[in-house]
Each structure stands twice: as structure tokens, then as C-alpha cells.
Amino acid sequence: MPAAISRNWPAPAKLNLFLHINGRRADGYHELQTLFQFIDYCDMLDFKVTETPELILHSNMSGVVADSDNLILRAAKSLQQTTGFNGGAEIWLDKRLPMGGGLGGGSSDAATTLVALNTLWHTQLSTEELAKIGLKLGADIPVFIHGFAAFAEGVGERLQAVNPSEPWYLVIAPDAHVSTADVFQDPLLPRDTPKLAIDTLMSQPWANDCQKLVVSKYPQVAKALGWLLEYAPSRMTGTGACVFGEFTQQQQALAALAKLPSEMQGFVAQGMNLSPLITRLSHP
């Protein structure tokens, strides 16, 4: 009897509510302080366990390449290698999040793959063990595996659960692809923001140290942010290109979305301190 397909595993987007760069390490990585919060806007993945070890990925988006560099396949392969599981999986990705926009879609897809297959393969790794696998694939992956809003330090791997407010956001995805590597290699990027205690950071105005540089180099980002600032406190997430405005009421965010210029694309979503992946995990 063929295995059933396990459906609707969410891979939520994240926002960096603030992002401070505190320095550059000898290995080239940057020391950061940032606040991650999920939003209820997700890619969705389906999985079918197979008896043979092949890993097969299908996607609804032509830009998703199912090769050895794909994070979903790398995550599944890493779980196979770590656990010695000799079966495989067929995976379907319904890609909804903008690619390369600073919303963490690729990292979230990889995290959901690790969490879902650990359940479906009955490999029984702990959350910490999954996070260690994830960290080798990308610095943002552990926060998606743990599934709670978090204050992060180091290169983003040291996480502390936090509980910020859960407002509504209007997220705009400018028609620009910002290279994270280029941003972090740019000599004009500020790298000297002092490290502060979490209580201080949570109570002061929030900012993104990458924003000024990205806005200066990408006019599409500058235009989107300038428009959004007319309606709400707004800033960039990650290294861009997406920007977000914060609203207390859903209707306020939807009203602003209705006025969005035709050349821009956006969506409204609510902040979530508990990832929908954790909710899905309780109904495998």
C-alpha cells in the first residue's frame, strides 16, 4: 500500500523587528543582535515517505531549482546522513513567499523539512539536534526549528524566547533582489553598533543597520519604504528587499494595502510569537 501524503506543513516568513551589527569576526561572519518574529504568511510543504533513499522535490514556482544546492534537499539529505535513515521522501513545495526578500523563506522551508521528516521518518531527534543540523545549513534556520519569537545574538544562533506584541503588518516586496553577501561585504555597512542588554533593546526605538546602505543602492527599496512610511512606522527586514509597516488593527493595514501603487506588490499578515509549524507538529 503506497504511503499517504502528509499535507500542509507551514513554513512561515519571519521579520527582523530590529537588526544591529556589532562587529565582524576573524572568520568573516558578523556579530549581530536581532529580534525575530514570525508572520502568518507561509510557504506550504507536503511530504510522502518513500522506501528508497531518493529525495524528489516538486515546486509550483519555476525559480525553485531542485538541485544539490537547494536548501530543502540539503536539509533532507543532512537528516538522512545524521540518522542513518535509509528511506527517502517526495516533497511538494507551494511557494508563496518572495524569494530573496529578507523574509527567510528558504531557511523556513529547510526548517520545516527537518521538523516534518524527523516526525514522518520517526528519526526522533530532539529540537536541539535538529537545530544543530540546521545551523550548518544556514544561520536563520534554528529560529524556525525552535518555533518561537526570539532575540538572537552571535551570528544569529544564540536564541532567547521573547514575547513582543503581535501587530498587523503590511509587507511590500520591491522588484529587486538584494544579495545578502554583497550587503555584508560592503565597506559602507556600519559594523559598530554597541551591544546592549535585551531589556534596553526591547524598550528603545527599533532600527535595521542594513537599511541605509540598501536604500542608497536600490531605488525600488527606497521608493517602497518611502511610500510605506506615509502610513505607519516602517523599516526593512533582514538585508531586504522587503519592507514592512506596523499597524495595530488589521483594517488599517488592509486600507493601506488598497492604496498600494500598481507597480508594487504587498500583503497583510499578523505577527506570531509561536510558529504555525509548532501547531502543525501536534497534528502529524
Curated annotation (Swiss-Prot):
It is an enzyme of class 2 (transferase). It catalyses: 4-CDP-2-C-methyl-D-erythritol + ATP = 4-CDP-2-C-methyl-D-erythritol 2-phosphate + ADP + H(+). Pathway: Isoprenoid biosynthesis; isopentenyl diphosphate biosynthesis via DXP pathway; isopentenyl diphosphate from 1-deoxy-D-xylulose 5-phosphate: step 3/6. Pfam families: GHMP_kinases_C, GHMP_kinases_N. One of its GO terms (biological process) is isopentenyl diphosphate biosynthetic process, methylerythritol 4-phosphate pathway. Its EC number is 2.7.1.148. Disulfide bonds: none annotated. It comes from the Bacteria. ATP binds at P98, M99, G100, G101, G102, L103, G104, G105, G106, S107, S108. Catalyzes the phosphorylation of the position 2 hydroxy group of 4-diphosphocytidyl-2C-methyl-D-erythritol. This is 4-diphosphocytidyl-2-C-methyl-D-erythritol kinase. It comes from Shewanella baltica (strain OS195). The lineage of its organism: Bacteria, Pseudomonadati, Pseudomonadota, Gammaproteobacteria, Alteromonadales.
